[in-house]
């Protein structure tokens, strides 16, 4: 099974999750600025909400790499929202990519809100989530 990990982060919160998933699966995680060089069965894509949507950079990544994405598995952080799946699915659907029902999400630090998140427990949970998805 070919698996890839990509993420986009402004604060560093989602990168922490990407690194935890990377360590659990022994697969290098990259920023969305790095295109997929080959077909992936599963793409773990991490992002957060910015103005109640995913960043246009993430949307562009999905569209520009559509021919190399089998299925998307979302992960992410945010201070307020509880899922990245809906906005990612909206984009993926336009280019015919399936999005897994499985998703990992945790709180992320935003100013004084949710200090120290994601924390060690969140990172452990993200790693366990990734292992479960690829079993």
Model-flagged regions — what are they?
Residues 3, 9, 13-28, 39-135:
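FMN-binding flavodoxin-like domain, especially the glycine-rich phosphate-binding loop
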Residues 33-39:
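Short amphipathic alpha-helix with an adjacent loop that forms part of the alpha/beta core around
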